[in-house]
Amino acid sequence: MIELDGIDHVALAVRDVRRAADWYIDVLGFEPRHEGMWDGVPVFIGKGTTALALFPTHDPKPIPRPHGSITMLHLAFRTDRAGFAEAQRDLRKRGIDFHFQDHEISHSIYFRDPDGHELEITTYEF
């Protein structure tokens, strides 16, 4: 069996790497990790053990994702009860629309980044 320690990073295609990095840094508190390598692509940002690799897309139009297509559905971040409440307050303050979902075992909020990637913040403490 292959022994894994966890997911190292998730690679996201974005229309503007700098804008996307700034958004994740400002909204979710990520920090710059690795920049300037490989001609600046990708830009790595992260928070704790979570990291994103931001790659520029060559097509500025959003990619249509028909229901049922094989693709990443959303990217979920875990927090505690206090962090979950703070995330909702902060998103409201920033004018970022989100919706709440009670999953019975967890509570989640869903919203989108500037490139349309669906993000989830979830807690198992409620």
Can you describe what each PLM-predicted range is?
Residues 1-3, 6-15, 43-46, 63-126, ...:
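Vicinal oxygen chelate
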Residues 30, 59, 96-97:
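Short beta-turn/strand-loop junction motif enriched in small, turn-promoting residues
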Residues 55, 59-64:
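A short, acidic/glycine-rich surface segment
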Residues 34-36, 63-68, 100-102:
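Short histidine-centered beta-strand/loop micro-motifs
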Residues 2, 13-52, 56:
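Core segments of cupin and vicinal oxygen chelate
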Residues 50, 59, 124-126:
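Residue-level signature for short turns and capping positions that connect secondary-structure elements
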